[in-house]
């Protein structure tokens, strides 16, 4: 890419480097072909119908078929101290429950993964807030659940699918003679809070509580009435206290989850209730994994040990941080919360890996602005089968923002969308005349 080295090209390229123009092209024509302003985004509209198979991105078919799958899971006791090997090249803040695809070719990494397969298949992913940070204080255990070895141009390559399991605090880091880091960590527990009404509610009367049956659909007027009636009965014991009912609902897991689900339905109109975790802990992690926030905010969420507080923070972020700007420019708006939509079963954002081993957490939006497109569309190693990708850069600073995806067939819907990498985005709070400055707004963290 223009103005960047080969190392950065490999990180931003989804597939192999392809010739963009014949060698005898003129320099001026080549420049026009190499960098053009994206005009489609100005007229982009949210797709009414999506006929793309949303299960394809989550299966990571670009890694190849016939991967060896493992069953069962490894969970360590809360507050226990464990020594876990660290995979060095993974620069990502992994959330429990989040899928992590990897493509490893360094002999040290290949050897390490082989050893892990023979043991508990668990490694540590350290959480760094920025590249310059030398020591991480927190992280997440990751467990390999699918694995494949192959040779590419005589080089042994290991392809892996792993999933985040448990949060931990780093106690000590040591490097072995073979160069592999070993992390001594303390597994962080999840604080499960009782119901907000448990202190004033008589247990003997619990069996007498009769709640109305849940509605089949959440879109009609009946569902709203059902929720109001349900809330009234659930918090009826608030009448015995000096505090109003709405105050207790602010710290009620079910109420918080319902408010977040309303936001998620704006991103995915076809969102099904049974596709989301019912457990508040798992649900809070699912939401954290698909929020387009920077590493600083994400580490703050990872530190929180209570699902209630995590849900409150996530709802606060979703309500306030409605604008996504270029992280390098900081003031160039790329997209907004209203343009986000889901093209995957796991939500609007997921982690993908390119052939060079770089992991990108990619957010799907149907409209983006202030972008230049670099090169011609390519289907090589596409994370969304049936779509060709084109590298997209910030129009102001030329930093890599993501890719534009265009359908290869006319009957596909959507015909185009944008995949923006989380590491290039900065969530911001829009400033209005009636509001205080964004840097003075404090999020619920």
Swiss-Prot record:
**What Gene3D superfamilies does the record point to?**
1.20.58.1480, LON domain-like, Peptide methionine sulfoxide reductase
Q: Compositional bias (Acidic residues) spans?
A: 24-38
Region of interest (Disordered), residue spans:
1-52
Segments of skewed composition (Basic and acidic residues): 1-10
Q: Where is the Lon N-terminal domain?
A: 84-322
Gene Ontology cellular-component terms for this entry are:
Cul4A-RING E3 ubiquitin ligase complex; cytoplasm; membrane; nucleus; perinuclear region of cytoplasm
Could you tell me the membrane topology recorded for this protein?
Peripheral membrane protein
Binding of Zn(2+) occurs at 326, 329, 394, 397
Q: How does it assemble?
A: Component of a DCX (DDB1-CUL4-X-box) protein ligase complex, at least composed of CRBN, CUL4A, DDB1 and RBX1. Interacts directly with DDB1. Interacts with KCNT1. Interacts with TRAF6 and ECSIT.
State the protein's name.
Protein cereblon
């Amino acid at each position: 890419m223009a103005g960047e080295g080969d190392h950065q090209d490999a990180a931003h390229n989804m597939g192999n480097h392809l010739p963009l123009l014949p060698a005898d092209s003129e320099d001026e024509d080549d420049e026009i072909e190499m960098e053009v302003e994206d005009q489609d985004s100005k007229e982009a509209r949210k797709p009414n119908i999506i006929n793309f198979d949303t299960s394809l991105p989550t299966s990571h078919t670009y890694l190849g078929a016939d991967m060896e799958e493992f069953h069962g899971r490894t969970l360590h006791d809360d507050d226990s101290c464990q020594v876990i090997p660290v995979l060095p090249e993974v620069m990502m803040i992994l959330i429990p429950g989040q899928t992590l695809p990897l493509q490893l070719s360094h002999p040290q990494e290949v050897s390490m993964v082989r050893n892990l397969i023979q043991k508990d298949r668990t490694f540590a992913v350290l959480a760094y807030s920025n590249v310059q940070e030398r020591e991480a204080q927190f992280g997440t255990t990751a467990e390999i659940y699918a694995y494949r070895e192959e040779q590419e141009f005589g080089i042994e390559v290991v392809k892996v699918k792993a999933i985040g399991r448990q949060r931990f605090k780093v106690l000590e880091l040591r490097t072995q003679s073979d160069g592999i880091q070993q992390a001594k960590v303390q597994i962080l527990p999840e604080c499960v809070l009782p119901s907000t009404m448990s202190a004033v509610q008589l247990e003997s009367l619990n069996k007498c509580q009769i709640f109305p049956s849940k509605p089949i659909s959440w879109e009609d007027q009946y569902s709203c009435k059902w929720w109001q009636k349900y809330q009234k009965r659930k918090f009826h014991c608030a009448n015995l206290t000096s505090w109003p009912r709405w105050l207790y609902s602010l710290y009620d897991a079910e109420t918080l989850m319902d408010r977040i689900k309303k936001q998620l339905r704006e991103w995915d109109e076809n969102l099904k209730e049974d596709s989301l975790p019912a457990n508040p802990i798992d649900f809070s992690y699912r939401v954290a994994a698909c929020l387009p926030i920077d590493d600083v905010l994400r580490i703050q969420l990872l530190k929180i040990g209570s699902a209630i507080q995590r849900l409150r923070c996530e709802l606060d972020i979703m309500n306030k941080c409605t604008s996504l700007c270029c992280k390098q420019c900081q003031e160039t708006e790329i997209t907004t919360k209203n343009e986000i939509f889901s093209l995957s079963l796991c939500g609007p954002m997921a982690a993908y890996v390119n052939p060079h081993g770089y992991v990108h957490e990619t957010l799907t939006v149907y409209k983006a602005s202030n972008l230049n497109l670099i090169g011609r569309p390519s289907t090589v190693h596409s994370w969304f089968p049936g779509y060709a990708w084109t590298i997209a850069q910030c129009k102001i600073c030329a930093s890599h923002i993501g890719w534009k995806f265009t359908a290869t067939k006319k009957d596909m819907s959507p015909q185009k969308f944008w995949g923006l990498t989380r590491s290039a985005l900065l969530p911001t709070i829009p400033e209005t005349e009636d509001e205080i400055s964004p840097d003075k707004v404090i999020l619920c963290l």
